[in-house]
C-alpha cells in the first residue's frame, strides 16, 4: 500500500483478538504491578439541576465501612478552571459554589471496594439554595433568565457573529421568492452510551503519574491532568488500553478522570474509578441538542433559491466541545447535497442546566442534514409537490471534478440524482403499504 489509504483496501487488524480472547479494558488491568493495592473512587453527585451550595455534609459517608477518605472541593483546595472555549465560564472540578446540572460531581469517596464507595456516596448530603433551572435553549435565552455563569453576562456563550460571520438578514433575504416556507425543529439530545462506560486508574511512581483512561484522545487529556496535579506534562504518562466505544464523547478529559491523580497523592495509594451505567447517562457528555429555525424559498416550479438556518446549540451546563465544534460543522454542511445559490447560516450556543454536550458522531453535520432535509419537505408541502421531485430539481448535478458549494464545502465526486432514482426503484413496490420519505446524507 502506498502513502495514502485513499482508494486502498484497508484490513482491520484488531478483530481476531476481540473475536477470540477478547480485549483488555481499563477494568481488566488486574495484573498491573503499579496498581497493586489500588483503592476505589466513587463520586457523589448533585441531585438538583441548579442551585447555590450552602453546605456539604460528608460525615456519615466518612464513617461507613471501608471508606478511607472523603473529599470536597474545599478539602482538595480546588481552584476554578476556565473553559477552553469561553474563559469567562469557570468551574471547580468538584462543584464548590453552585451546581449546574443533575449528576455534577460534588464529592469524592475513596474506599476499599467499589460497592462500599457507592453506598457511602448515597449518604453525602448537600444543602442547596435552589435556583431556576433551564432545560432548553429558548427558556435559557428568555429575558430575565437567571445566569448559569454570572461572569458570562448571558446564557448565550457563543455566536458565529463574533467571528465576523454575518447575521441572518431575516425576511429581506427572501424578497423575490415566489414561495416561502418556515419551520422550527428540534434535533433531540442523545446520550452516547458506549458499551464500556468511562473508567480510569492512576498510580504515582517515583514522582511520575501513570494514568490509564478509556479515551479516544490521550493527547487531549495530558494538559488538564498535568495542570491539575501541578506537574510538567513530561511527568505524566497517559495509557489507553482497548476502548469499548466512545463515539466522540470520550474525547478529552472529564473532571472525574482529571481528579484521580490529585486524590491519589492525598491518600498515597493507586486508585481506580469506573462509573455506573446510570452515571454514564447523566455525566458522560451528550450529543446533538439543536433547535433549528429554518426558512426556505424559491419558485413555484420547485426550484429552491434561498435557504436560511439559525441553529441554537444547547451546550448543556459547561462550555465544552459541543458549544463550538457542533455549530462550526453545521454551517459548512448546511447546503447538504443541494445546489442552493443563496444560503445564510448562523449558530448560537446557549448554556442550560443539562448534561454538557460534546462531539458526537458527526458533530454538527448530521444536524445540518436533518435541517435542510426537513426544509425540503416543508417546501414540497407548501407547493403540493412530491418531495422526491423537489429534491431531484435541486440536487447538485452529476460532477466528476470537485464541486464547491456556496458555503465553501468541496465535494470530490457525486451523482446524487442517480442515487435518488435507484432508491425510488426499490421503494415503488412498497408505496401501497407504507409511507415513503426521503433524505440524503453526504
Kindly label every feature range from the protein language model.
Residues 43-71, 108-128, 200-267, 324-333, ...:
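Alpha-helical support elements that line or immediately flank enzyme active sites
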Residues 71-104, 138-150, 220, 238-259, ...:
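Short, surface-exposed loop/turn segments at secondary-structure boundaries that line and modulate
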Residues 425-442:
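Single conserved hydrophobic/aromatic residue that forms the stacking wall/gate
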Residues 99, 202, 263, 296-297:
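A structural signal for short hydrophobic beta-strand segments in well-ordered beta-sheet cores
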Residues 8, 13-20, 155-200, 289-375:
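Glycine-rich loop/linker segments at domain edges
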Residues 73, 235-241, 268-278, 305-310, ...:
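Beta-strand segments within the central parallel beta-sheet cores of soluble alpha/beta enzyme folds
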Residues 1-155, 183:
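Flexible, low-hydrophobicity surface segments
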Residues 24, 48-50, 75-77, 106, ...:
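Short, glycine-/Ser/Thr-/acidic-enriched flexible segments
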